Amino acid sequence: MVKLNENTAYKRGQELLDAGQYEEAIQKFSDVIAENPRAWKAMNSQGFAYQKMSKYTDAVECFDRALAINPKSVEVLNNKGVTLSMRGLYKEAIACFDEAFANDRTSLEALNGKAIALQHMFSYKEALDVLEEAMKIDSKHPQTLLSIAVTLQKLKQYDRSISFFKKVLSGDKYNTKAWNGIGVTYQLMGDNESALKCFTKILNINSQELQAWISIGYVYQKMFKFKDALKCYKKAQAIVGGRYTHKLYDGLASCLTKLSEFDQAIEVYKLIYQSEEGKRKWDAQRSIKFVNKLKRKQAVGQLPDIIPKTDAEDTDASVAE
């Protein structure tokens, strides 16, 4: 039997992970773990790949296996915290971030992760308190500035929010998250034209930037330009090669609903239901029921002129995650 070169296999797994080939990466990390059952770094990377596929339960299992071997790993604790937060288990996520920060009092990832979880719990003041602590460690850290900007955005302090996004741009004028954040803020202020200019700026930086196409599609929906929005979502699909991404498919399903393409919308919501766990899964289930109801109304000529927003339509345009 040929002995596997663990380092080479792990490196190849990381390359596959970076390329978005998550299933192939998971298999490569499995090969590493089969050769060395204590390869906790491979378990961590495997968990990250599962997270990217929205398989949060599998991801947490991988992180727990890694932590059983290396319980002090700040990286694994932070990854587990992010995954739990994505799963909607915010208190459990905060516990992971607190443990990570206790192990490393300079972990900005832990503080930002905790702040984002608090945002989702609508605890914005507490989130700002955590981010203030992060600023004491590094006042120019881009992710911290983005997190503060998003928190202020949630508090409807739009001018202050934009000022923090601009602080990020002062250090990196090509930061697409900051441009997206400013665009989202303008959209929340009702200035769709300024929002579109920001998102177009992103495409001038990188025409393949997925979030920009999704954001433009979202604004077009707000402007009732549903056919233009659909073109944006189709472009985004082409960029990812049809690979599932929640924000993309949620926006696509919403747009198809507004265009009265109910059968297509239902199929997309079914894909979301099959791909997700937790709140997103049940939101998709409610949306399927909602669109079926609209379909029945259409059949008897009782469909409203303007389709109302579906239960699961994602209005959270956060850029800090």
Q: What residue ranges belong to the model's regions?
A:
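Register position in tetratricopeptide repeats
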Residues: D18-A19, K52, M86, H120-M121, ...
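Structural marker of alpha-solenoid helical repeat scaffolds
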Residues: E35, I69, N103, I137, ...
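Canonical positions in the second alpha-helix
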Residues: V32, R65-A66, E99-A100, E133-A134, ...
